[in-house]
């Protein structure tokens, strides 16, 4: 089987026949206790605040280049008892570079018809990369420089079958996080418990990632995700990857169905701009976690489908979703769940850990923001601003949105015990159009009110009282990032502070 590593970029784009590319080995089990548990069974405590010693859990935090610019479909309000699926997230992400159709080898006649970029079959036929995507990424591909060849050979000798001839980023931007592939093991067989059982070890202020699909809603505590960074799950029949990069405070959910195949995602052990770089088990493409773009490998230039989620306090999750389930501690790994392996990290000053980019001085690098990108427009809402106003009504990419503020959510990166951490708050975003009417929200005592009907809304975006009771605002894809991380990949972002 021929790998694309032996093919030039021009061959990939001009091939009149489908190109078959060998698939990567399916690594369906995580690397046990690698790098996180000592031989005697103890769990060392990494310390990101001390960059002289790479933390064992500084596994990767990766961000993807500019996300798709397709205009979202306006959300429609529905009566539901769970978080609805995304109605505003782009369903067919694509890079922002203008699509082109590369011509064939120079033709003798000016009337010759250019050869269209061929579809590319990957992973032993499991995935077909559309020719349109192949064509779009061509102008963005970056050939490895000679001084990067040595590092590429080290990766290959370590077992990587990634197609390193295809990259949309410079290899000089990729740094080792100090652990091998899946040295921070993802959770591949998650188990869930009801709230009464989770109450024994999960404080109401602790942050949880909330995701729902097809009648199921689940919470993923950061006290667990901090140690694993990825949970490969199936929610309501939908395969998803719930991801968290502690170094960037970025919690995002992605669809694991990619071009018709279901992928398992792992932690590459590498970072770019301090952000986690994930990998998939079918093509071994490397993916930027913060934006979901394939940056190295056969699927470089392709974007994962992001799904809307919320980062809120566990108590708020229970109040909004009384039947929701919680990711349990029975993960198959021995970890000191509840203990923060990055104590004091979010209070650190200066350049973030393993960050080599330029810092945007519009905010302190470690300040949190609610970040949204819709229709090519990126916006960040500073936590300090949200704390002072309680709610923000805005329009992003032509879509009316609202950002709700919750003040009590604890930091997962402050005190050694997350339950004892300071409150940093959290922000959630929704579309604010209901039945063709744009609502305007105001903060209240633990809830929110719209001016148009006087209905009361919860932090989860559900009307709990008033004329619109039972209506759920459609969520938008957003996250609570550290400012430096968001600004590194969206330098033109509009900042609301």
Residue locations for each model-derived region?
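N-terminal secretory signal peptides
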Residues: 1-11, 15-31
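Secondary-structure transition/capping residues
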Residues: 23-27, 36-38, 328, 497
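Residue-level detector of alpha-helical recognition elements and their boundaries
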Residues: 27-28, 62, 260, 332
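Ser/Thr-rich, Proline-interspersed low-complexity disordered segments
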Residues: 35-145
């Amino acid at each position: 089987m021929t790998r694309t590593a032996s093919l030039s970029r021009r061959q990939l784009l001009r091939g009149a026949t489908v190109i078959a590319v060998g698939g990567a080995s399916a690594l369906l089990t995580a690397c046990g206790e690698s790098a996180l548990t000592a031989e005697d069974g103890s769990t060392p405590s990494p310390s990101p605040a001390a960059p002289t010693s790479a933390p064992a859990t500084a596994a990767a935090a990766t961000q993807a280049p500019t996300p798709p610019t397709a205009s979202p479909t306006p959300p429609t309000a529905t009566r539901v008892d769970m978080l609805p699926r995304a109605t505003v997230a782009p369903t067919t992400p694509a890079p922002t570079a203008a699509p082109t159709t590369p011509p064939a080898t120079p033709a003798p006649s000016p009337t010759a018809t250019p050869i269209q970029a061929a579809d590319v079959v990957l992973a032993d036929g499991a995935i077909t990369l559309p020719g349109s995507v192949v064509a779009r990424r061509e102008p963005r591909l970056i050939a490895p420089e000679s001084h990067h060849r040595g590092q590429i050979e080290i990766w290959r000798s370590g077992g990587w079958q990634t197609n390193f001839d295809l990259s949309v980023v410079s290899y000089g931007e990729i740094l080792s996080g100090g652990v091998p592939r899946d040295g921070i093991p993802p959770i591949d067989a998650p188990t869930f418990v009801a709230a009464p059982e989770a109450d024994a070890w999960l404080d109401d202020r602790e942050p949880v990632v909330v995701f729902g699909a097809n009648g199921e809603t689940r919470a993923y505590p950061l006290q667990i995700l901090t140690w694993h960074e990825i949970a490969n799950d199936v929610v309501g029949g939908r395969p998803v990857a719930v991801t968290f990069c502690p170094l960037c405070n970025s919690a995002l959910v992605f669809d694991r169905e990619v071009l018709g195949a279901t992928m398992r995602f792992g932690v590459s052990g590498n970072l770019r701009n301090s952000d986690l770089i994930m990998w998939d088990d079918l093509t071994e493409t490397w993916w930027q976690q913060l934006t979901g773009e394939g940056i190295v490998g056969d699927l470089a230039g392709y974007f994962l489908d992001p799904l809307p989620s919320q980062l809120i306090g566990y108590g708020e999750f229970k109040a909004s979703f009384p039947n929701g389930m919680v990711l349990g501690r029975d993960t198959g790994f021995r970890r000191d769940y509840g203990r923060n392996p990055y104590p004091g990290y979010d209070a650190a000053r200066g350049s973030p850990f393993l960050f080599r980019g330029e810092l945007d001085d519009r905010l302190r690098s470690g300040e949190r923001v609610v970040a949204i990108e819709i229709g090519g427009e990126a916006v960040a809402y500073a936590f300090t601003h949200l704390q002072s106003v309680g709610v923000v009504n805005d329009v992003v990419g032509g879509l009316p949105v609202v950002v709700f503020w919750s003040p009590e959510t604890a930091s997962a990166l402050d005190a050694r015990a997350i339950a004892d951490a300071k409150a940093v708050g959290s922000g959630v975003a929704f579309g604010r159009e209901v039945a063709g009417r744009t609502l305007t929200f105001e903060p209240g005592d633990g809830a929110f009110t719209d001016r148009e009907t006087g209905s009361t809304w919860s932090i989860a975006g559900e009307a709990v009282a008033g004329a619109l009771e039972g209506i759920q605002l459609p969520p938008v894809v957003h996250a609570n990032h550290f400012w430096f991380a968001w600004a590194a990949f969206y330098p033109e972002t509009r900042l609301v502070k």
